[in-house]
Curated annotation (Swiss-Prot):
One of its GO terms (cellular component) is host cell nucleus. Belongs to the influenza viruses NEP family. A motif (Nuclear export signal) lies at residues 9-18, 82-91. Binds M1 protein. May interact with human nucleoporin RAB/HRB and exportin XPO1/CRM1. SUPFAM superfamilies: Nonstructural protein ns2, Nep, M1-binding domain (SSF101156). The gene is NS. It comes from Influenza A virus (strain A/Duck/Ukraine/1/1963 H3N8). Transmembrane segments: none annotated. This is Nuclear export protein. Its main location: virion. Mediates the nuclear export of encapsidated genomic RNAs (ribonucleoproteins, RNPs). Acts as an adapter between viral RNPs complexes and the nuclear export machinery of the cell. Possesses no intrinsic RNA-binding activity, but includes a C-terminal M1-binding domain. This domain is believed to allow recognition of RNPs to which the M1 protein is bound. GO terms for biological process: exit of virus from host cell nucleus through nuclear pore.
Length: 118
């Protein structure tokens, strides 16, 4: 379940943040939260099926936003992979492995939602 996965990853990253003064980690947490909200809103639009007009009226540039989210996901995947390579802490390794898996799942969910809306 990606909802509980998001919560778990964010909680684990917050714990890691306490042990470091890394602004990068802070940025990653913010992007994960933003990604979760975006995925949830796309999911809601799909659940209301036929709500494409509502989605478009809220944001006439939803395709542009979709493209931007995919870029953010790719950036996060690269950032997580980089962190995974440089950390030797097992708690961090597990967290970043879970984050990577979550990002791949969410990318697929967003892709599926967007195809249904198109």
């Amino acid at each position: 379940n990606t909802v509980s996965s998001f919560q778990d990853i964010l909680m684990r990253m917050s714990k890691m943040q306490l042990g470091t003064s890394s602004e990068d980690l802070n940025g990653m947490i913010t992007q994960f939260e933003s990604l979760k909200l975006y995925r949830d809103s796309l999911g809601e639009a799909v659940m209301r099926m036929g709500d494409l007009h509502s989605l478009q009226s809220r944001s006439g540039k939803w395709r542009e936003q979709l493209s931007q989210k995919f870029e953010e996901i790719r950036w996060l995947i690269e950032e997580v992979r980089h962190r995974l390579k440089i950390t030797e802490n097992s708690f961090e390794q597990i967290t970043f492995m879970q984050a990577l898996q979550l990002l791949l799942e969410v990318e697929q969910e967003i892709r599926t939602f967007s195809f249904q809306l198109i």
